[in-house]
Design a protein with these regions (language model features):
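Non-catalytic, conserved peripheral segments adjacent to functional cores
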Residues: 1-108, 129, 136-177
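Conserved metal-binding segment of the jelly-roll/cupin
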Residues: 105-128
């Protein structure tokens, strides 16, 4: 059984779409989502401290989330059920500040995203019961939890239907504020 993880492309600087091993046989499917040694081999140093599962109805928008120092964290995310549009906003100082990219993740592909510190993260669920799994490199700290208002930066969420957004996410500051 191969344990190959491959960087498929750089989405934003140091933010990677990574393919992971997927094995299918008569019993079903087996996925290897994380292997510290394999990640080190492709140049990604990541030691996770916590893991979360987010289950969402269709048209739910969550984000744009990040944590402030000293609890900032890198993340590995993947979609284990349904499908999502994953949105990444660079909030690091420098030439890439304000860059935004998105990618569709779904349960049938074998991709995950490595998100470094300094990237605000959010997503829109494209199906009922979409499930996103997060591994983070630091423990969640409510006092350091921050966010950017989902519609305050240059990204088209394609909201033909009214999105479902928590009051917490609706009260985040605007990107330019």
């Amino acid at each position: 059984m191969s344990s190959v993880f491959n960087i498929e492309r750089e989405i934003l600087p140091n933010t990677y779409l990574i393919s992971f091993p997927k094995f299918i046989d008569e019993r079903g499917t087996f996925l290897k989502i994380y292997n510290e040694d394999a990640f080190n081999e492709i140049g990604i140093k990541f030691n996770y401290k916590e893991e979360f599962i987010s289950k969402s109805h269709k048209n739910v928008i969550r984000g744009m989330h990040f944590q402030k120092p000293p609890y900032e964290h890198s993340k590995i995310i993947w979609c284990s059920r349904g499908s999502v549009i994953d949105v990444l906003l660079d909030i690091r100082t420098g030439d890439n500040y304000g860059m935004v990219e998105s990618i569709i993740l779904n349960e049938d592909d074998n991709y995950l995203i490595f998100i470094p510190t300094g990237i605000a993260h959010g997503f829109k669920s494209l199906e009922n019961n979409s499930e996103l799994i997060y591994k983070t490199s630091s423990i969640y700290s409510k006092a350091h939890d921050e966010g950017i208002l989902w519609n305050s930066f240059d990204y088209d969420w394609n909201n033909n239907d009214k999105p479902i957004i928590s009051s917490r996410d609706l009260n985040h500051i605007g990107f330019k504020d």
